[in-house]
Amino acid sequence: MRTSHLSRADPPAKDRLRRVEGRHNALVKQMRRAFSRAELTEDGACAIEGVRIVQEAIRSGLRFDAVFFRESAEGQAKRLLPQLGAHVETAVLPDKLFASVVPSETPQGVAALVRYRHSSLEDLLAKLATGPLVVVAGLQDPGNLGTILRSAEAFGAAGVVLGEGTVSPFNAKVVRGSAGSLFRLAVVRVKLAEVLVKLREKSVRLTATSSHKGVSLPEASLDGPLAVLIGGEGAGISKDVMAMVDEVLAIPHAPQVESLNAGVAASIVLYEIARRKSAG
């Protein structure tokens, strides 16, 4: 559901802002809890922070429940309020209270609760004809996951599956790193075993990345329904899971570089798949 813009009947932006000073305000508590837990609220809302991310949520047509502005950043309110529907709860918070709500050490002055659009594993599997499925196993670094989400959208992936042990996609650093891709990309969180069974049932070829061993990426076959498995930074992919992989892809790089991080490796593989697809 897309957020409507203000109509002529909507109140002027300056009249929509109410001042909230109490730490125990229900929405303040809800947003603080969502940020600290890095999970959705009971109502299915995601806490986001920063001008660019809020603008991406607006552009993606997400429904906003509430938007908070830092008192010293009211100029941002004047720019953003006309883009928000009149039903959205908007408030200005004293700087100290605002800083206690958001996790960023240098907050940009705006935070919001937006309704996340859910997808199912079946939704992702139905899109395999459009692009590869990215399967993430045990990845803990939020920056890497944010990069993977951004690259998955950029290079036409069908979606991203997050297995157990993977950082929450609603972690503030993941949301920021995805640059809005989290709002538009199909992302599901399920047990890895369930995903692997489904992929086998649908004859989807499972590939994994390696820095040294495997088929060199430029020489690998990347046709047909394909899933790309990305492991964590430390332990990587377990032996049991690797035993189910159809092909290991080795990304050529200078020998003095031990390895590529998960975000870079995923991006390179996804780019190569997209490049070949566009080349016909």
What are the functions of these language-model segments?
Residues 1-79, 166-167:
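Boundary-proximal intrinsically disordered activation/regulatory segments immediately upstream
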Residues 4-5, 52, 59, 94, ...:
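RNA substrate-binding interface of SAM-dependent RNA methyltransferases
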Residues 112, 151-155, 164-181, 239-280:
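Structured adenosyl-cofactor binding patch, chiefly the S-adenosyl-L-methionine
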Residues 84-103:
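A glycine-rich helix N-cap at a beta->alpha junction
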Residues 75-87, 241:
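Short, aromatic/basic amphipathic alpha-helical patches
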Residues 207-257, 261:
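Active-site/ligand-binding-proximal alpha/beta "capping" segment
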Residues 105, 110-114:
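C-terminal edge-of-domain segments
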